C-alpha cells in the first residue's frame, strides 16, 4: 500500500531496524527474510535520499535523518495499532505477554516481587523486563517503548495517565557505631555529615530524598554516589556517613543488616509512589489487567506503610 509514493510497509521495516539495530534481528521481528529486509533498506534510502543506517562493528548505526524520523514513525504505528487494529482480549492463564517496567531497585525489592509472585500463580506465561530508571522515561512512554513507570509522583509526566500506589516516609540511617547519630539529629549536624546517595542515569538524576531536600533549599555533602538504593545500607557499615532512605526499605533490611535509625531533622519527608502508563495503552486489555494487579497489591502494602509511619521514632539500633 502506498501513500504519497511511500510504501507504508517500509515504515514497519524502519521501526524494526531502529529497535533492533541488526539486520537479521530486525527482519526476524517482522517476519521478513534477510534479503527482503535488505531490499527494504534500499527502498527507504531511495525514498528519503539518505543512507539512514551505517554499518559499524556489525551494528546498524542510524544517521541523524533516521533518528529524526524514528519517533514519528513509532508514534504513527502505535496509533494504528491502538486506534485501528482491535486489541486482543487477554486470557491471563494463556498469555505469554512480556511487560517492560521502569522502577527503582528499592521498589523491586519491597513491592514488585509481590506482583511477580501473584502473576506467576495467575498467568505463568507472562514475563517481565524490569529496567533501571534512566534520563528520559517520558520519551520512552511516548514512544510506547514501556508498559509502566513506577516512581514517586513528583517524577510523573503530566501527559500520561497515572495512579497513586502507596505512601512512605524518609528516615536517616547509619552504622550502629556512628556516634554522631546518638540523640536527636539536628539539621546542623545532618548537613555537616558525609552522605551516601542514590542517583540515576548518565545525568545523575536525583532520587526522591535529594529532590525533597532541594525543595527545602538544602544541599548535602554527598561523598558516595550509587546507582540504586539497595547497596546503601552495606556501604554505611564501619563509617560515620549517613543516608536518607525510605522507611519500607529500612524495615526490609532490619533482619540482616545492623542499622541505626533516627528521625530526619526536617519536617516529616513523605512521598507517594505512583504508577504511570502510556496514554496510547490506556484501553489495552493487557495493560488494564496488569494495572489492576499492581494497584491491588499496592493497596495491601499501604496499611503496613501507614502503620510504620505512625510509629514513634526514637534513635534505634540493631
Curated annotation (Swiss-Prot):
NodD regulates the expression of the nodABCFE genes which encode other nodulation proteins. NodD is also a negative regulator of its own expression. Binds flavonoids as inducers. This is Nodulation protein D. Keywords: Activator, DNA-binding, Nodulation, Plasmid, Repressor, Transcription, Transcription regulation. Belongs to the LysR transcriptional regulatory family. GO terms for molecular function: DNA binding; DNA-binding transcription factor activity. InterPro entries: LysR-type_TF, LysR_subst-bd, NodD_PBP2, Tscrpt_reg_HTH_LysR, WH-like_DNA-bd_sf, WH_DNA-bd_sf. It holds the Pfam family HTH_1. Residues 6-63 form the HTH lysR-type domain. Residues 23-42 bind DNA.
